[in-house]
């Protein structure tokens, strides 16, 4: 049958898909001069940040103690340019006025944020070093820090989270969420950039972990695979829609351990030095030092 016989079907589909009511809420109107967030550019940003934080493990593998300053300098310059463009894309994308081009003020703001982010890279390296140390110390199968940095999906997910969290704190819209969802796709770990997580954090056998937007996690906390730190319920507004931004996820204090497939829901507190066993649901506060495990089935 000739393709021409299908022309009316294709035309009808185009007409229906072009009706404004059909794409209401699904359409982003592009304006000339407004950059859009780029998945490729954001991947490059993450790889550059990794190459700066973990020199020699990512990026140029020929870096040594004599050339490290040069390589970091080159990567920082590239990172600044790429990050400025993507931050600008986020600022323009998140603007309430979709019909106006990005302003010079927004361009200056994007460059300022990129510079401040880069100024925080030494602190990001310091805290990620504690995460690597926690993973190494907590896993007898790990033979070196290099193995942890190169191989462990948890370190990849935590690195993305810490980069994204810093950008979120600096006021960047959209981009932080894309960065953590990239790690979600790669590793199966869903860490919202809004969560606050202390140092020496590790996820053993890192996959399937969910950490919600308003979670607060102290220092030296260890999660195992499949742990969910989620919301128990969503308060609704007068229109029946979830109220955004309210605290609704758990607080884990220092030195907490949560074993595999445990589910902890709601704005509850797991006290310092507590242990939560695997495959259980927790919806109430857990005292400091407590040990919560499954109860034995009654005969």
Named regions from a protein language model:
Residues 1-178:
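Terminal amphipathic alpha-helical/low-complexity segments used for targeting or macromolecular assembly
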Residues 183-299:
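Structural signal for interior beta-strand "rungs" in well-ordered beta-sheet cores
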């Amino acid at each position: 049958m000739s393709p021409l016989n299908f022309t009316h079907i294709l035309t009808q589909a185009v007409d229906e898909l072009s009706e404004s009511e059909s794409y209401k809420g699904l359409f982003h109107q592009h304006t000339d001069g407004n950059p859009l967030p780029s998945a490729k550019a954001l991947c490059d940003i993450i790889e550059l940040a990794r190459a700066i934080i973990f020199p020699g493990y990512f990026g140029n593998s020929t870096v040594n103690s004599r050339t490290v300053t040069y390589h970091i300098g080159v990567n920082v310059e590239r990172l600044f340019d790429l990050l400025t463009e993507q931050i600008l894309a986020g600022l323009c994308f998140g603007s309430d006025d979709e019909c106006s081009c990005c302003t010079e003020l927004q361009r200056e703001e994007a460059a300022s944020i990129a510079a401040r982010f880069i100024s925080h890279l030494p602190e990001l390296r310091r805290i990620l070093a504690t995460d690597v140390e926690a993973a190494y110390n907590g896993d007898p199968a790990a033979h070196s820090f290099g193995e942890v940095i190169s191989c462990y999906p948890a370190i990849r997910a935590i690195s993305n989270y810490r980069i994204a969290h810093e950008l979120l704190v600096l006021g960047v819209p959209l981009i932080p969420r894309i960065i953590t969802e990239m790690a979600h796709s790669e590793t199966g770990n869903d860490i919202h950039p809004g969560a606050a997580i202390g140092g020496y954090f590790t996820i053993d056998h890192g996959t399937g972990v969910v950490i919600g937007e308003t979670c607060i996690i102290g220092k030296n906390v260890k999660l195992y695979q499949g742990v969910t730190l989620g919301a128990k319920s969503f308060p609704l507004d007068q229109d029946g829609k979830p109220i955004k931004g309210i605290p609704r996820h758990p607080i884990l204090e220092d030195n907490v351990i949560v074993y595999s497939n445990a589910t902890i829901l709601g704005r509850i507190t797991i006290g310092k030095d507590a242990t939560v066993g695997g495959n259980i649901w927790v919806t109430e506060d857990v005292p400091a030092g407590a040990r919560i495990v499954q109860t034995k089935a009654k005969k």
